[in-house]
Amino acid sequence: MRSSAKQEELVKAFKALLKEEKFSSQGEIVQALQEEGFENINQSKVSRMLTKFGAVRTRNAKMEMVYCLPAELGVPTTSSPLKNLVLDIDYNDAVVVIHTSPGAAQLIARLLDSLGKAEGILGSIAGDDTIFTTPARGFTVKDLHDAILVLFEQEL
């Protein structure tokens, strides 16, 4: 098996184990991965993976401290299209509001601002996971909303 394919399998197994929310130590994760056939896994590798994928220790339903990967804290990978970071696009009479994955709003806002007035964007304000975008003169909020939907290939 190619090393990149083996790495993908390891990541898949690692994420699946953390979704079970029953591992309270890195040693338990190492043991579970070894039982799944990843003989060369060790504690330092698990530690790096926990950091890379943004794992946190939290209490599960049984009130045990366990490692988990909260979906809303998922770290985007280099192969993730930007559209996957956009969760919702809505508007009112004044602005278009875009909800993103945590930490992605400034990146998406910068992209929108780079399109500029010719595309109907006067400007954007971004927090951690929310963007307010206002239309340029000559464009309606609905026009801007529809253009952003097309840009991120969302359903109308």
Curated annotation (Swiss-Prot):
UniProt pathway annotation: Amino-acid biosynthesis; L-arginine biosynthesis [regulation]
Gene3D superfamilies named in the record: 3.30.1360.40, Winged helix-like DNA-binding domain superfamily/Winged helix DNA-binding domain
GO molecular function: arginine binding; DNA binding; DNA-binding transcription factor activity
PANTHER family per the UniProt record, alphabetical: ARGININE REPRESSOR
GO cellular component: cytoplasm
Annotated signal sequence range: none
Function noted in UniProt: Regulates arginine biosynthesis genes.
Family as reported in the entry's similarity comment: Belongs to the ArgR family.
Keywords, comma-separated and alphabetical: Amino-acid biosynthesis, Arginine biosynthesis, Cytoplasm, DNA-binding, Repressor, Transcription, Transcription regulation
Transmembrane segments: none
Keyword Transcription belongs to the record: yes
Gene: argR
Keyword match Transit peptide: no
Chief place where the protein resides: cytoplasm
Compartments, record wording: Cytoplasm
Lineage: Bacteria, Pseudomonadati, Pseudomonadota, Gammaproteobacteria, Enterobacterales
NCBIfam families hit by this protein: argR_whole, PRK05066.1
Single Gene Ontology BP annotation: L-arginine biosynthetic process
Pfam family, one: Arg_repressor
Cross-referenced InterPro entries: Arg_repress (IPR001669), Arg_repress_C (IPR020899), Arg_repress_C_sf (IPR036251), Arg_repress_DNA-bd (IPR020900), WH-like_DNA-bd_sf (IPR036388), WH_DNA-bd_sf (IPR036390)
Name by which UniProt lists this protein: Arginine repressor
